[in-house]
Amino acid sequence: MGKRRLHQCSSLHGSVDATEDHACGTLKTPARRARENVTMGQRDAFTIERDALDGLFAALRERGYTVLGPTLHEQAIVYGEIGGCADLPAGWSDEQDGGHYRLLRRDDEALFAYNVGPHSWKRYQLPPELRLWRAKRGEDGRLTELREPPREAPRYAFVGARACELHALGILDHVLLGGAHAGGREASQRVRREDVFIVAVQCTQAGGTCFCASMGTGPTADSGYDLALTEVLEETRHYFTLDVGSERGAELVADLRHAPAAAEEQASARVARERAAAQMGRELDVSDIRELLYRNYEHPRWEQVAERCLACGNCTMVCPTCFCTSVEDVTDLQGEHVERHQRWDSCFTIDYSHIHGGPVRSSTRSRYRQWMTHKLATWIDQFGSSGCVGCGRCITWCPVGIDITEEARAIRDSEAAGTPAGER
């Protein structure tokens, strides 16, 4: 065993502890050790003070990333391009319930004390609108595809991704990066996704419609990130614990003013995360959920929910995993130019299932049943996992407050009570 000696290494970013390994003669900073530990499957934790957090945004921009994160816009917390801490929703939280969302002012300056809003990271994996190709009619009357020079894919850094959202990103990766659902565009999807730098934020409180604990997707993120922040507010101190999840995450930490996390700091962060798990607003019994829905395909509950459902598609638009799209061809009046666009669509629109002769699912009953059964049952057959991560967006942003957890519970309870599937 070589001797190790503690040093103080000064840099432009402040002083950090380092150790010298006499066996190999190298000086190891905590960030360098973290990079080596990630390679060996170990995780290191650091702390970063609130007033040093802007250094994180600066380091990401220096690496060529467009930084995306939470910001206030039109009375909601949404995702957009941010420059630093000044753009974060400092001092804001939210109140959520079925069909209800309201911002609340806090009595502190917490940066990440909100729950997930109407936006998800899906819009950067699967853009709401994407031009697939365009063509122009030549002098000979034939259409010629106009090929655009290859454009460098944007390098995104996602700041503020929650545990349920990391699972949603993984689910969409499985859908979009292979198989028939990729639509032959696996290469562009892979480029768009692989270079994303993810700074996760651990939930320290749960929203009124959250049920990620039931789905096993949160509230604590254990993987899928480069760095993970846990916000800790004390009477005289505001800081973050910083967990390293990748080699490039460890490399970025080296550019920040940081310190190894002490045991009491890690304990405070752990208590904050456990508080979120204890506050979960909803729960969903997923035992036998796939078979439960298959057994109750003709259950009267589908008709009952259809009487409330507006078939507006809000639930599918805010869902972080729904991937329905449609393709539309657009021409000019002279027929000289044509473009093909891919746009988000919803299985709640009557035209989505339209084939020759009419729509396959003409009733709201059949469309809601399709959505919920796909999300909780047939998705498992297709992709090997549930399509629901328990984020609760579909509950919050439903205009009439339809609750997927309540609908599943109603079917389960009626079956347990012995109510025949075809009777009210």
What are these regions (language model features)?
Residues 38-294, 299-302, 322, 333:
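Iron-sulfur-associated redox domains of electron-transfer enzymes in respiratory
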Residues 28-39:
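Short, Lys/Arg-enriched N-terminal segments with co-localized hydrophobic residues
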Residues 286-307, 325-424:
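Ferredoxin-type iron-sulfur electron-transfer modules in oxidoreductases and energy-metabolism complexes
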Residues 12-18, 30, 170, 218, ...:
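Secreted/processed peptides and extracellular or luminal domains of membrane proteins
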Residues 8, 14, 18, 23-25, ...:
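Short hydrophobic alpha-helical segments enriched in small aliphatic residues
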Residues 6, 12, 164, 212, ...:
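Short cysteine clusters
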